[in-house]
């Protein structure tokens, strides 16, 4: 695909970059820990995944439909304000914005944690780790001050790189799959309904970010067409990666060991391919964190800009640079993070 076909007009992102924003923001650090949490329930967790995917699919369809009807930046905030008024819109914008920049701090810390595999000096040194995490936040803030296209390129590259370990385990990992790890199907001692409900709740937070492409809609080429396609494609890619890779890990590692694993994907890779594969997973996890950080930092500037344009946030948040970047919201949120 040519550069022009993906970007449309200058300064906007196309289908692939919008899709990478969805996939990249969804697949942060959490997916690399989720198999251990689900191992407490056993193979029945696959049903929790399926119910959660079904619910996320309906939610994605709602966002896709709304993005065709309301072509303005802001995503969930804009849709809430349009449907329920200024007060509801403000509450959604305020709560969502806080969740973004506070979550960014956690993502940065998690990314530094994975980097410690390669840089032992980060282990047991909270001050150094904090400084590196702060540095990561400001590095991606700097990237986000350049242009939406540059942010999109970084997002696309990090997304492609970080899904490689998930694809490897979600495909080749099944060559080492032991079906006995799924017997009995329910390890929790609870009823099947309770186990499925619990695993669905655990899986649900892995789908945070499916709405990402709707927020910078005025920076998306032909948004009424691109955003629905990117949202559905991004959700589908992430869901397939989640289910395949998680089931593979559960089939590789004995349930009793998996429940206590601090790095289930790395442990599974080590069992299958050796120590070098564990390092590959750690690198993928670090890139996953920093790729998600890049995408969420983009949104931390776009959301308050949309609210400021409609006089629900201070007008200064609507100011943009020559590149069309809402620099005040971007910088202020990074300071808070």
Residue ranges and their predicted role:
Residues 68, 75-82, 89, 120, ...:
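Short amphipathic alpha-helical coupling elements at transmembrane boundaries
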Residues 11-22, 85-98, 132-136, 190-203, ...:
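Select transmembrane alpha-helical segments in multipass membrane proteins
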Residues 36-40, 49, 57-137, 141-145, ...:
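Hydrophobic transmembrane alpha-helices that form the core helical bundles
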Residues 23, 27, 47, 51-55, ...:
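Lipid-exposed faces of alpha-helical membrane segments in multi-pass integral membrane proteins
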Residues 10, 15, 130-134, 221-225, ...:
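Loop-to-transmembrane helix boundary motifs in multi-pass membrane proteins
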Residues 3-10, 45-46, 122-129, 156-283:
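Helix-loop-helix junctions that connect adjacent transmembrane segments
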Residues 1-36, 40-44, 57-64, 72-73:
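Membrane-interface "cap" regions at the ends of multi-pass membrane proteins
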Residues 21, 32, 60-63, 89-93, ...:
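Alpha-helical transmembrane segments and their lipid-water interface positions
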């Amino acid at each position: 695909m040519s550069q022009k076909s993906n970007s449309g007009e200058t300064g906007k992102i196309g289908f692939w970059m919008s899709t990478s924003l969805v996939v990249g923001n969804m697949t942060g650090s959490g997916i690399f820990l989720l198999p251990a949490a689900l191992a407490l329930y056993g193979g029945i967790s696959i049903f929790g995944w399926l119910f959660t995917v079904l619910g996320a699919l309906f939610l994605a369809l709602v966002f896709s439909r709304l993005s065709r009807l309301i072509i303005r930046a802001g995503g969930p905030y804009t849709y809430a304000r349009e449907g329920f008024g200024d007060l509801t819109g403000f509450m959604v914008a305020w709560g969502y914005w806080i969740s973004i920049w506070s979550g960014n701090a956690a993502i940065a810390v998690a990314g530094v944690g994975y980097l410690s595999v390669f840089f032992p000096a980060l282990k047991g040194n909270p001050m150094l780790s904090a400084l590196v995490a702060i540095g990561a936040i400001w590095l991606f803030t700097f990237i986000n001050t350049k242009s939406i296209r540059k942010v999109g390129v970084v997002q696309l590259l990090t997304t492609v790189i970080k899904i490689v370990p998930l694809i490897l385990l979600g495909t080749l990992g099944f060559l080492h799959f032991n079906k006995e790890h799924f017997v009995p199907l329910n390890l929790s001692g609870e009823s099947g309904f309770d186990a499925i409900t619990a695993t669905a709740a655990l899986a649900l937070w892995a789908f945070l970010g499916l709405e990402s492409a709707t927020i910078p809609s005025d920076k998306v080429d032909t948004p009424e067409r691109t955003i629905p396609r990117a949202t559905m494609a991004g959700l589908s890619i992430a869901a397939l990666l989640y289910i395949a890779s998680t089931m593979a890990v559960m089939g590789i590692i004995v349930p009793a060991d998996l429940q206590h694993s601090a790095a289930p994907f790395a442990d599974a890779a080590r069992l299958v391919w050796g120590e070098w594969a564990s390092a590959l997973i750690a690198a993928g996890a670090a890139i996953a964190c920093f790729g998600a950080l890049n995408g969420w930092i983009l949104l931390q500037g776009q959301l308050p800009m949309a609210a400021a344009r409609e006089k629900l946030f201070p007008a200064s948040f609507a100011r943009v640079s020559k590149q069309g970047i809402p620099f005040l919201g971007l910088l202020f949120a990074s300071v808070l993070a």
